Every structure is written in C-alpha cells, then in structure tokens.
C-alpha cells in the first residue's frame, strides 16, 4: 500500500513494482543473479552457523518491536534499532525528483505534518492485537507523493510495513500505540526516537509466524555495489567541473530509482556537488557511508551537531496524532568534535617511534 496510489491504474502499478524492485535489489543474493552487488559477505555466528535469516542479526535490529503475537501469547519482533532522522527523510525526493523543501508543487511546509486523508480520524488504540489497516488514516502529507526509494526503504506511522511479515499478513505500523509498535515504559530501549524506521535489508517475503519460527530469503551484507561506483564517478567529475559526465552518471542511478533525469537547468536549484552529495545520501542510505562521507567532505562540524538531530515526537506514551507529529530534538548525547576528522594513532605505535606525533586533539 502506498498513499496516493490507491487507484488501480497502470501508472500506479508500475510505481509499486519499482518500489518492490528496489527492495529486492538490496536483499536478493547471488543465487538470484543480482548484478547490483559486487562484493558482500554472508554473516555468520561465532560458531560458523548461518546467521542471516529473516529473524537474525542485521535484519532483526531494524524491525519494529512487535511483529506478531505468538501462539503462547508472547510477542515476536525486533529492536527498532535504526531510526532515520528528520534530516535524513528530508533528503529523499518527491515524485518530481526534488527535495520536498525545493519542490514548488509539493505540499506547503505548514501542511507536511497534517493528515493526508482529510476528515479521517485516528482509530482506537489496539491493546491485545496489532493495529489494523485503519491506521493509514494517520498518514501525513509529508509521506505522500514521494519517490520510490522512500517507500522502499523508509517506514513511517500508518504505513504498511511489509506485506507478509505478520504471520503471512501485512503489518500496519502504529508508532503512537504503546501496546504495539510505539514507545512503552516497559520496553524503553526498543522504540524509534525519530518517528521513522529503516526498511533497508528487510526482505519483502520475510515472515514471522505465530508458531515462533521465521521464513524468508537470506541476504548479504553489502560492501560494494554498482550504485556506489556510479556515484563515485559522478563525484569525481563534479570535482573536475565536468558537468555533463557528472550528470550522466547521476542519471543512471536516478533513472533506475524511478526519478526523472537531471539537466543543467536543475543546477539553479542546487549546485552540481550538492546534487551529487544528496543523491549519494539517498541511494546509500543506511549502508554505512554517510559518517565517512561527511568527514572527508569536512562538513561534519555542520551536519553532526546536536541541533541537527531532530525527529517526530515518538518517545511519548500513547501520544495523540497532534502530539506525535511535532518536530523535536532527539534526546541522545550526540556531539561532534573537530578532532574526529582524524583518527588517533595507537599509543603502542607512538611509543615505538619518538618522531611520530599524535593527531590533534587526542
């Protein structure tokens, strides 16, 4: 289910297929002839046993905290382990291929956190079972009219998280309900502190069964994939002011993602390097690149300050629609220090060579 794509039209069906393709592009392993992945590893437990089934490791850490109620009355679920910030979800484009704040045809910013389905109201909070499809009434306009990658990799309040994960049924995500997927005083560690979740590396056919078992395709932890190579080329060309070549490589990624191609006219909206960096942040979202990118670009002192880390008001017990949909600072001890641009030299190395000098600030 994608809000705004309810009508049974060819255009909407193609959009949904694009979303599903992007999910499988990240999770399908070499046995499915996935040519996107160049180098990846098969995660293992310490005893050598395979650890990458749908219920383990990297996948489980990203899952919502309650996925299915098991036959014995207990719950199976994940840890809400990775939650994108407000800045991260704002980088993803609208359907028009522009950041939301720069798209004149997108909703006014004053409307972003208002209901898309006008006249609808929040359903009663479920207590003993997961929330029903009615929770889509709480989808806000910010989450409508976005590009395919947004729906493939970002989970938000009211969305259909995955089609089969709840005992072969969809999971409808309610991040306001402390009895299901929301913040709970009895389980304060497993809650999204931003009001969003990552869906990257969640296999679309993954299932948590009421019996307690799981099923679904295995995935690999990606080290290098094709998109990164195109983005690397685009960045190099942009640094050399070779605009045509930079756009050509960027557009390979955008076209596959279902986003319109960039032209030189778009350079009036953002500079070429800003387009390159934003495209990299979207395409490689949650793959471990961003921290190192902002360091080598030397912009970490701008984008890694505590004031930059914001999200929706998800760390509240059973908030109302209005209480939840507020932008608030993330309550985490986040701090950037300029010394982090360089890593320290190990003391053992320093002591072995009197001519070595420690990196500044350590």
Task: Please provide the spans of the model-predicted regions.
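Acidic/polar-rich alpha-helix caps and helix-coil junctions
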Residues: 1-86, 90-362
């Amino acid at each position: 289910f994608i809000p705004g794509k309810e009508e049974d039209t060819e255009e909407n069906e193609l959009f949904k297929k694009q979303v599903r393709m992007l999910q499988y592009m990240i999770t399908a392993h070499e046995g499915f002839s996935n040519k996107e992945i160049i180098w990846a590893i098969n995660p293992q437990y310490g005893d050598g046993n395979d650890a990458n089934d749908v219920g383990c490791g990297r996948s489980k850490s990203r899952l919502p905290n309650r996925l299915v109620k098991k036959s014995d009355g207990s719950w199976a679920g994940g840890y809400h382990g990775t939650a994108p910030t407000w800045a991260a979800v704002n980088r993803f484009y609208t359907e028009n291929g522009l950041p939301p704040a720069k798209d004149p045809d997108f909703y006014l910013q004053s409307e972003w956190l208002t209901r898309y389905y006008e006249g609808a109201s929040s359903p009663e909070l479920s207590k003993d079972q997961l929330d029903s499809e009615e929770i889509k009434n709480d989808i806000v306009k910010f989450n409508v009219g976005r590009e395919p990658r947004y729906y493939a990799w970002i989970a938000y309040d009211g969305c259909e998280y995955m089609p089969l994960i709840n005992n072969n049924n969809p999971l409808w995500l309610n991040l306001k309900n402390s009895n299901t997927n929301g913040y709970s005083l009895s389980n304060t560690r497993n809650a999204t502190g931003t009001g969003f979740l990552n869906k990257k590396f969640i296999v679309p056919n993954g299932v948590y069964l009421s019996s307690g078992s799981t099923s679904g395709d295995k995935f690999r932890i990606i080290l290098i994939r094709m998109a990164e190579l195109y983005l690397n080329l685009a960045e190099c060309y942009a640094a050399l002011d070779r605009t045509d070549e930079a756009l050509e490589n960027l557009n390979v990624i955008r076209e596959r993602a279902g986003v319109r191609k960039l032209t030189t006219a778009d350079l009036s909206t953002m500079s070429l390097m800003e387009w390159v960096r934003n495209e990299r942040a979207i395409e490689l979202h949650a793959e471990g690149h961003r921290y190192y990118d902002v360091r080598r670009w030397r912009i970490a002192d701008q984008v890694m300050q505590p004031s930059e880390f914001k999200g929706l008001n998800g760390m509240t017990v059973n908030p109302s629609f209005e209480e939840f949909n507020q932008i608030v600072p993330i309550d985490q001890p986040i701090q950037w220090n300029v010394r982090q641009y360089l890593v320290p030299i190990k003391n053992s190395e320093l002591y072995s060579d009197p001519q070595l000098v420690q990196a500044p600030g350590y």
